[in-house]
Regions:
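C-terminal regulatory/interaction module of P-loop NTP-utilizing enzymes
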Residues: 1-307
Length: 307
């Protein structure tokens, strides 16, 4: 049996909740996360094999939301680790509660006793960070562990994750190896700002999330911005698609499409026009240079393309 395998009652509950790919896609849609067949298949296999799932794609295409939606579908906690340059075990896994250790030493001294290393470096003195909390989650269903933007971390941190990814375990030098009773469902995301190590990829299922078609994007943004004009949603999706095909440095993701539609709807816009685009361009393009590219190409042209 794989050390990552979910067994017993938890496995049965997961199989009952998502018996097949179609049911998984429908349940994800119920929490307003729309997937195509490829992504639904990857998530399903990740649950059943089980194996960590590595999602790569441009910023804003919905990688992080996949982990959040999966936790909602499985009705289990989401434990999120946001990666950054320089992150290490103290932030990700654990650190020792030195003030508590010192207090215990002083208390023991006042009683004429001495605390040994095994007593001071035991589970009671651990400050549990996201990775350890996910491993020690008591169930009944495994937690969803979202390791977000792993490409922001360095090679050493990737190496540190290998034991967790491959064996659902971590080793703490003073304690030993801690193995998960309910191995977490692991979703890693990357914006591909750098290549991840092959050792990480070998331990994961891989899926690239591309930008959705304008038709799919209309469905997504309408679900996320309740009460918005149908016509406006179509125009926004098509206009954003044209922006992605232009020479902008940072193409807008789905998150920006949602923000833009929300801003336009708040202003009472029902149909997109050049004036509305000009006023709200900062909701969808976050670099001045990119805004100038779109303005130079003509806002009227952008709007006509969005009809």
């Amino acid at each position: 049996m794989s050390p990552r395998e979910v067994t017993g009652e938890a496995a049965g509950e997961i199989r009952q909740l998502v018996p097949d790919i179609e049911t998984l896609a429908r349940r994800l849609a119920d929490v307003d996360y729309l997937v195509d067949e490829g992504l639904a298949t990857s998530i399903f296999l990740s649950l059943r094999l089980p194996q960590p799932l590595l999602l790569e794609g441009e910023a804003g295409v919905g990688k992080t939301e996949a982990g959040k939606a999966l936790a909602l579908v499985l009705d289990t906690p989401l434990i999120r680790l946001q990666c950054y340059d320089g992150i290490d075990a103290a932030e990700a896994l654990y650190e020792w509660n030195y003030p508590r250790q010192l207090l215990s030493i002083r208390l023991a001294d006042s009683r004429g006793a001495t605390l040994g290393e095994e007593e001071l470096f035991g589970p009671d003195y651990l400050i549990r960070r996201p990775l350890l909390r996910a491993l020690e989650h008591p169930g009944p269903r495994p937690a969803v562990l979202l390791v977000d933007e792993i490409d922001r971390a360095d090679d050493d941190f990737e190496a540190f994750l290998l034991e967790l990814l491959g064996e659902a375990a971590v080793t703490i030098p003073e304690i030993g190896t801690i193995r998960a009773t309910h191995p977490p469902i692991i979703v890693l995301t990357s914006n591909r700002t750098r290549d991840l190590h092959d050792a990480v990829k070998r331990r994961c299922l891989y899926h690239w999330i591309a930008y959705p078609t304008p038709e799919r994007e209309v469905e997504i943004v309408r679900r996320r911005v309740k009460g918005s004009s149908d016509t406006l949603a179509v125009q926004v999706a098509n206009a954003v698609s044209r922006m992605r095909d232009s020479d902008v440095q940072k193409p807008p993701g789905i998150a920006e499409s949602i923000d833009w539609l929300a801003a336009l709807s708040l202003l009472g816009v029902e149909r997109l026009d050049a004036a509305a685009v000009d006023l709200t361009l900062g909701s969808v393009l976050k670099y001045g240079e990119d805004q100038e590219v779109i303005r130079a190409a003509g806002l009227e042209q952008l709007v006509r393309g969005g009809d």
